[in-house]
């Protein structure tokens, strides 16, 4: 099995790098999942193992995949067919999923402040957020004088509003109720 993983690794890496560049990681994951299921089918495995020509294997595989795989995915499968590697698609999928998991460990955090955040503050903030989120943090800093003072931190669904503007808005809401 480790030999198949070794064979699959460069294909998975190439597919993942392309998917990242094209901002289509989820689309590629769906396509590779479908193609891996096709490669696991006993009839397809039998045909590919029977000594079919590269052209026959490529044609059959692309016909079975049909519109489930876009043109870039088809090109990827053609390369795998030419190199007689279609049967390692399940391992390519496993490697792709592992690369995606590593990739997703980074979270993009938007930090808005009334004044520019210093390099020292960025370092301290990054360390604190990495500890809290248990992920590598990429800070995107913005300046918005309307928040008066403090910070507004947004990471995915999480929002920490430590701005004076936010505190005043919460106070106004409390006083109105």
From Swiss-Prot:
Principal subcellular localization: membrane
Sorted UniProt keywords: ATP synthesis, Cell inner membrane, Cell membrane, CF(1), Hydrogen ion transport, Ion transport, Membrane, Transport
Membrane topology: Peripheral membrane protein
InterPro entries: ATP_synth_OSCP/delta_N_sf, ATPase_OSCP/d_CS, ATPase_OSCP/dsu
Transport found in the keyword field: yes
Pfam families (alphabetical): OSCP (PF00213)
Cellular-component GO terms for this entry: plasma membrane; proton-transporting ATP synthase complex
Highest taxon listed in the record's lineage: Bacteria
Alphabetical list of HAMAP family matching this protein: ATP_synth_delta_bact (MF_01416)
Function according to Swiss-Prot or TrEMBL: F(1)F(0) ATP synthase produces ATP from ADP in the presence of a proton or sodium gradient. F-type ATPases consist of two structural domains, F(1) containing the extramembraneous catalytic core and F(0) containing the membrane proton channel, linked together by a central stalk and a peripheral stalk. During catalysis, ATP synthesis in the catalytic domain of F(1) is coupled via a rotary mechanism of the central stalk subunits to proton translocation. This protein is part of the stalk that links CF(0) to CF(1). It either transmits conformational changes from CF(0) to CF(1) or is implicated in proton conduction.
Quaternary structure and interacting proteins, as annotated: F-type ATPases have 2 components, F(1) - the catalytic core - and F(0) - the membrane proton channel. F(1) has five subunits: alpha(3), beta(3), gamma(1), delta(1), epsilon(1). F(0) has three main subunits: a(1), b(2) and c(10-14). The alpha and beta chains form an alternating ring which encloses part of the gamma chain. F(1) is attached to F(0) by a central stalk formed by the gamma and epsilon chains, while a peripheral stalk is formed by the delta and b chains.
Family membership: Belongs to the ATPase delta chain family.
Record protein name field: ATP synthase subunit delta
Species assigned in the record: Colwellia psychrerythraea (strain 34H / ATCC BAA-681)
Name of the gene encoding the protein in the UniProt record: atpH
